[in-house]
Amino acid sequence: HQIDPDSRQLFLLAIQMDNYTGCVACFRAGDLFDYAVENILQEIVGEYGGGIVFHSEGHVFYTVLHVAAKSSIISPKDRALSICERFRISIKNNLKNTCSIYIDQPRWLEELPASYIEITEEQEANHHLYYDTIVNLEDNSLPSIYQRAADDGALPVDPIDDVLDYI
C-alpha cells in the first residue's frame, strides 16, 4: 500500500496503554506484551490501510496510518477513527487491557515531525484525563460514532457494529 504524501489520508496515532505496567507483569517477559500490542496494531493496519507501527518507550505505541476512502460517503477521517476503534476493541478483547488513542492528521508528510511533537505533548499532558477513549486532536471531541449516541440522549455504547460498517 503506497503512501501518497500529498493526500489528506495520512494520520498519526498515539496508542497509550492504560495499565501498561500491570499488563507487562502478566507476561513472562516485558517484550512479549510489546510484541503482542505491535502485532495486533500491525495486523489491523495491514488489513484496513497502510503504514507503520512503532514503540518508542514506555506505555505509548505510535502508528503512521494511511487510509484510502472506501467510498464517497465515508471520509478518510471517519475511516481512520473507525480503525482507531478497531484498535481499542482488539486490545481490550485480546489483551484484556484498555487504551486511549490520540489521533492527529498532518496535512503533508513534512508535517509529521510537528504532528509527533503535538500528539506526544497532548498525551503527556492529559494522559490522566482520558481512559479507554479516542481523542481527536483536530477538533478535540469524541468520534462521530460516539457523538451520535450521545446526541440521541442515549449513553455511549461500544460501537463495534458501526465500526465494521465504516471499515
Predicted regions and their residues:
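Hydrophobic, helix-rich cores of sensory/ligand-binding and other regulatory modules
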Residues: 1-167
